[in-house]
UniProtKB/Swiss-Prot annotation:
GO terms for cellular component: cytoplasm. PANTHER family: HISTIDINE--TRNA LIGASE, MITOCHONDRIAL-RELATED, HISTIDYL-TRNA SYNTHETASE. It comes from Shewanella oneidensis (strain ATCC 700550 / JCM 31522 / CIP 106686 / LMG 19005 / NCIMB 14063 / MR-1). Belongs to the class-II aminoacyl-tRNA synthetase family. It comes from the Bacteria. InterPro entries: aa-tRNA-synth_II, aa-tRNA-synth_II/BPL/LPL, Anticodon-bd, Anticodon-bd_dom_sf, His-tRNA-ligase, HisRS-like_core, HisRS/HisZ, HisRS_anticodon. One of its GO terms (biological process) is histidyl-tRNA aminoacylation. Homodimer. This is Histidine--tRNA ligase. Its EC number is 6.1.1.21. It is found in: Cytoplasm. Coiled coil: none annotated.
Length: 425
């Protein structure tokens, strides 16, 4: 027997038993962004490597350690996209979507990072994100947070997630704070872990995000970014909090919250949960007003967020919130005897035409009634429609209930569509 080929480590199949939950999550995401008037954008999985070096930052973990990068036959350096924002900006610049325009966009698709696979963190993962361009005021920051809060409400996990909020100020304010933070860290250099020492000069704000307990203890006395904010940044953050208070979205200001990507400024946020262990962040984002110009466009304010679908699915499973996932099939059509096969197929086709949302599965492959009923039960259908010689002669179909103890009944074929529409509504 030939050796089986396995999936690449950290790149997982989504099996038929799992896909209904994924479809439910995706449907919630699509309906939510539609309710806010956002438009979908789809970008290639592969981009020029320079796109991510220029946007994410060359000294970030993603660019230094995690990207899937290769040379094609022309000698060009290409990368499987590790996140969606940079591709969205590239597409907006390339196609003239962002110049003097407001755009509210969303995307969904696979991303790739060469990380150590663990629960909730994979090398191929599916990301959903929204990106808004051309609006620099705090009200649009509030809108993306209201949209994210609506997602949790529709998924039934509002009580299990918490919003953490911070501001990074504008580039000048952040530069001044950066110098103060470096000066502080230099005083404690010998006590910093290896990662923090490496980041101290290249990306000191990332030290604030260290998980090392000793580093966190040192940071308790570090200068606060809030003390370096100018009036405009302070007002922006104050207005955002006022708007969130007005609509009842609770949050916690976390002055240590920074994002792992270099392009963020002012508002940054994360939705976190205590239900997934170390992988507690379920959605993250913020404002990135300089990225469009950094990638060759005009100065354009921008804000957005991204979330990993694997982590949302895992959270729903962990919280046992998967019971209401419907079966893939509503009705199973079975023929009792070879002479009835043609009519059974015709009944199934008639139902699909009359009731486009009804999910109808026809039995194929022959077999006795017991075998067909076993498959019908396994399909998850509510009812089986049985068509035999007697049913054909009388112009009826026998309806057998599979999920309750109701007695089977006969329904006239010309009334079957109306009967099933009422039964499955």
């Amino acid at each position: 027997m030939a050796k089986q080929i396995q999936a690449i480590r950290g790149m997982n199949d989504i099996l038929p038993t799992q896909s209904p939950l994924w479809q439910k999550v995706e449907a919630v995401l699509r309906s939510s962004v539609a309710a806010y008037g956002y438009s979908e954008i789809r970008t290639p999985i592969v981009e020029n490597t320079d796109l991510f070096k220029r946007s994410i930052g060359e000294v970030t973990d993603i660019v230094e350690k995690e990207m899937y990068t290769f040379e094609d036959r022309n000698g060009d350096s290409l990368t499987l996209r590790p996140e969606g924002t940079a591709s969205t900006v590239r597409a907006g610049n390339e196609h003239g979507l962002l110049y003097n325009q407001e755009q509210r966009l969303w995307y969904m698709g696979p991303m790739f990072r060469h990380e150590r696979p663990q629960k909730g963190r994979y090398r191929q993962f599916h990301q959903f994100g929204v990106e808004i361009y051309g609006i620099g005021s705090a009200d649009i920051d509030a809108e993306v947070l209201m949209l994210s809060a609506r997602l949790w409400e529709k998924l039934g996990i509002t009580e299990h997630v918490t919003l953490e909020l911070n501001t990074l100020g504008d580039p000048a304010e952040r530069a001044a704070y950066r110098e103060a933070l470096i000066a502080f860290l230099e005083q404690h250099k010998d006590k910093l872990d290896e990662d923090s020492q490496r980041r101290m000069y290249s990306n000191p704000l990332r030290v604030l995000d260290s998980k090392d307990p000793q580093v966190q203890s040192i940071l308790a006395d570090a200068p606060a970014l809030m003390d370096y904010l100018g009036e405009e940044s302070s007002q922006h953050f104050a207005q955002l909090r006022e708007l969130l208070d007005a609509v009842g979205i609770q949050y916690r200001v976390n002055s240590r919250l920074v994002r792992g990507l270099d392009y963020y400024n002012r508002t940054v946020f994360e939705w976190v949960t205590n239900s997934l262990g170390s992988q507690g962040t379920v959605l993250a984002g913020g404002r990135y007003d300089g990225l469009v110009a950094q990638l060759g466009g005009k100065e354009t304010p921008a804000v957005g967020f991204a979330m990993g679908l694997e982590r949302i699915v895992l959270l729903l499973e962990t919280l046992a919130l998967t019971q209401d996932i419907p079966a893939e099939v509503d009705v199973y059509v079975a023929a009792m005897g070879d002479n009835c096969l043609v009519e059974a197929i015709k009944v199934a086709q008639e139902l699909r035409s009359a009731l486009p949302t009804l999910r109808v599965m026809s039995h194929c492959g022959g077999g006795n009634l017991k075998k067909q009923m076993k498959r019908a039960d396994k399909s998850g259908a509510q009812v089986a429609l049985l068509i035999g010689e007697e049913e054909l002669a009388e112009g009826v179909v026998t309806v057998k209930y599979l999920r309750n103890d109701n007695e089977q009944q006969r329904v006239a074929r010309n009334a079957l569509s109306a009967f099933l529409a009422e039964l499955t509504k």
